[in-house]
């Protein structure tokens, strides 16, 4: 029948056990079994300690035998490393390590040496007072410190130079590699730490800019001679340098600018949202009025589960979301967005109403005149017909009242095929009837 030793990590609540044959297990074997069972690694970065749960005494002797059916507490702490001068000179930094659990994985138990007592041992304190014992303790410490000073005075000092500083210093010695440039003066024959302008207090030259953070698609390569161009001239021409040592200039984002111009033109053509606002139409019927916005119904929808009243789609959806899906008219709960039904008949009535308003007032759905919208589509810049002496459909007659546009005969284009001849300002005829009324010679 196998024996058992119960163990528990100090940071855990559950208890585990180690099975073995015999009446007891040494501390060394117990630590090795715990490391292997919990897969703690090779033991180079931690140290493992075992304590008695009752007295909290550490089992520091690897040869001590722990009897079976014993409960212990296991604690894992960081390893304590100590480096010697010889290990540093040999380049093996991790050779000397003190207080780790490597020996439990490799199977090499620790050999404890008996401490050698110095000659300055404490005398028999029996029959002495407390003041005498304190004085004896200070005297012993003073003797030990004097002995340590004598040993240190006879020791030979060994100076160690860091290898990392030596390697970093050797990297920046010699000529720079191809493509390297000093960002301070623009030279290619020296490192920036050896720049001649470092010791010049009057140097105010501008550094050459780098392309950090700029996408490559916005950079254009150029060919220049850096020997004949100063950093001030490069900064004036906005020339930058890449990590490969190539000279580039930044270009504009044409695609984004074209998209912005296209959206701006579409907004000008499509007009604004004023026709859906409250008070835009004075003769708006009540059946085409949105109960939420007070304006014309836009994409009318119905609440099929409650009052069955038409609302504007966007306004009703926002109202339902803000009120936790409560109908704004009859206050019925659980009116989800999926229950909204588009009202096709009401949408046709809205379109018919807009057509009537366009015929009555001569304005289209977007609030612009039909001919004006057609001119915007033909010329988005809005400059057509302003520089030429062409009569617009809304020209005025002698009385100053607008003249309705006269349809052109079939076959004649609505715009002149050839440019109009230049007419000086003094000879401009403002009223075409004056030419007929002038006396003929």
UniProtKB/Swiss-Prot annotation:
> Where would you find the membrane-spanning parts of this chain?
none
What GO cellular component entries does it have?
Answer: cytosol; mRNA cleavage and polyadenylation specificity factor complex; nucleus
User: What is an example of a Pfam family matching this protein?
Assistant: DWNN
| Feature: compositional bias, Polar residues | 384-400
**Sites of Phosphoserine modification:** 221
Question: What is this protein's function per UniProt?
Answer: Component of the cleavage and polyadenylation factor (CPF) complex, which plays a key role in polyadenylation-dependent pre-mRNA 3'-end formation and cooperates with cleavage factors including the CFIA complex and NAB4/CFIB.
Annotated protein name in UniProt: Protein MPE1
Source taxonomy: Eukaryota, Fungi, Dikarya, Ascomycota, Saccharomycotina
